[in-house]
């Protein structure tokens, strides 16, 4: 029995007297929240109340208050407001809980400047939304692996090559694998004796 409470308008077992123990945070709304305030609507049943107009998910000091993810019973705190909760054992935990981010592929809730889903720290092309991977680790000037993106690396698994300017099947870097000694001439690619003239007798030069 609670001597400091005597009325319970909404019938949720939390009293209306705001100065008493276990005061109902929402005295006219039946609720089952117990974590941040008593007796308010808690849709997902995790103990933290759904946010309301006068009770937001973050306090003025930046601490979690109402449920930042009111439809997920495994998450409730989302201090940076990016939609990913801070409980590491819950659904889709925030990998960067102190920064508001939109990444969702390699990590959840981290900065993703180009909006491609990959976090900036893991994206070799953080300002190009069409590229995010460089498997062979060659120069970023060679471009990314996505063949439909900007400036693609035509040989994404060969760190010695990335272009075939003349389209003859031999690659621009003459010192790399399958190199082209004449990168701007599709009729020539080899110059075994190094005299500046191509070996293909049917080609130019």
Regions found by a protein language model. Give the residues of each.
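Extracellular calcium-associated, cysteine-rich motifs in secreted modular proteins
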Residues: 1-205
